[in-house]
């Protein structure tokens, strides 16, 4: 079991992103960040734009600093202080930076240090589908919130430790198999991506039919209804939640963004190298 835990309340920004609050430094300087399972770096703006990190205002600053998430304090965390940003980076956005939760690449992610400092071994996401409710979502470091899922999670092993990546066996449109993934496809759950991305050949079919019933793994189906994969735009405009992307990583690659993670409570378990899905509640 995890020795500690922290619950982070998330704000839903029009179904396009989910962000919550962290603190950096001693005393903590507060920032709102997107918790992104598709990247590994923590970065916040330096004291030149937006909510800004001021290194001289922290007694623990060394080019690393303490990061406070809920009741957890992660010590000596590397992060990027962004001193310059493109003018439109934060256009109409309510968050300051990004906290990466994928595997170690060029820096040590926050959750690696949580693990190494004996704090937590897993974290889980619940993303609220109702933009009108005050509670936008919840990120739990160190456990699961039983109020936000039904039944048991279906766990799949991580196949490649760069993203939280796993294999999928089939993609169905309606109840019909496309057969596209018979030779093998890969996917990763990405809380920092708004849409669901996949190979052009299949996404074109989905967007033509706009009747996807989901993805299949280990003979367990995860369905998507029109309310879950169609986004609301201006007035009478509707936007497809599927977007084409022809990338490969051990096979054709799907990115299961917020469109997928809203209906499915998602667990990222580093202790056992598993990703788990259960119906969200």
Swiss-Prot record:
pH-dependent activity: Optimim pH is 4.3. Active from pH 3 to 6.5.
Q: Which InterPro entries match?
A: Aspartic_peptidase_A1 (IPR001461), Aspartic_peptidase_AS (IPR001969), PEPTIDASE_A1 (IPR033121), Peptidase_aspartic_dom_sf (IPR021109)
* A Pfam family hit: Asp
> Glycosylation: which residues?
213
Q: How is it modified after translation?
A: N-glycosylated.
Cystine bridges: 181-185
What is the superkingdom listed in this entry's lineage?
Answer: Eukaryota
Q: In which tissues is it expressed?
A: Pistils.
GO cellular component term of the entry, any: endoplasmic reticulum
Report the locations given in the UniProt record: Microsome membrane; Protein storage vacuole; Secreted, Cell wall; Secreted, Extracellular space, Extracellular matrix
Q: Which GO terms describe its biological process?
A: proteolysis
Q: What top-level class of enzyme does the UniProt entry assign?
A: hydrolase
Activity regulation description: Inhibited by pepstatin.
State the active site: 36, 190
Which stretches make up the Peptidase A1 domain?
18-278
Asked if Plastid is a keyword of the record, the answer is no
PANTHER family hit by this protein:
ASPARTIC PROTEINASE A1, BETA-SITE APP-CLEAVING ENZYME, ISOFORM A-RELATED
Q: Which family does it belong to?
A: Belongs to the peptidase A1 family.
What interactions and quaternary structure are annotated? Heterodimer of a light chain and a heavy chain. An intermediate form is produced first, and undergoes proteolytic processing to remove the internal plant-specific insert (PSI) and the propeptide.
Would you tell me the protein name for this molecule?
A: Cardosin-F
| Organism per entry | Cynara cardunculus (Cardoon)
């Amino acid at each position: 079991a995890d020795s500690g835990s922290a619950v982070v309340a998330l704000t839903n920004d029009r179904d396009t992103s989910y962000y919550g609050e962290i603190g950096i430094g001693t005393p903590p300087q507060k920032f709102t960040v997107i918790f992104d399972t598709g990247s590994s770096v923590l970065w916040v703006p330096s004291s030149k734009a937006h909510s800004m990190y001021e290194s001289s205002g922290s007694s623990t600053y060394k080019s690393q600093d303490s990061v406070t998430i809920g009741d957890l304090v992660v010590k000596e965390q590397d992060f990027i202080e962004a001193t310059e940003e493109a003018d439109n980076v934060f256009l109409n956005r309510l968050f300051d930076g990004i906290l990466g939760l994928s595997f170690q690449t060029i820096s040590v992610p926050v959750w690696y240090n949580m693990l190494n400092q004996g704090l937590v071994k897993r974290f889980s996401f619940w993303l609220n589908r109702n933009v009108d409710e005050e509670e936008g979502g919840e990120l739990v470091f160190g456990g699961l919130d039983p109020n936000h899922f039904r039944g048991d999670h279906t766990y799949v092993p991580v196949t490649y430790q760069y993203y939280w990546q796993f294999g999928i066996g089939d993609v169905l449109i309606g109840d019909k198999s496309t057969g596209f993934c018979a030779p093998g496809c890969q996917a990763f759950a990405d809380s920092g991506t708004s849409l669901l991305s996949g190979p052009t050949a299949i996404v074109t079919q989905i967007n033509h039919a706009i009747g996807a019933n989901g993805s299949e793994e280990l003979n367990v189906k995860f369905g998507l209804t029109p309310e879950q994969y169609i986004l609301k735009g201006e007035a009478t405009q509707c936007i497809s939640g599927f977007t084409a992307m022809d990338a490969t990583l051990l096979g054709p690659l799907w990115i299961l963004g917020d469109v997928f993670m809203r209906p499915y409570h998602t667990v990222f378990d580093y202790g056992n190298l598993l990703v788990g899905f259960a119906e969200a509640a």
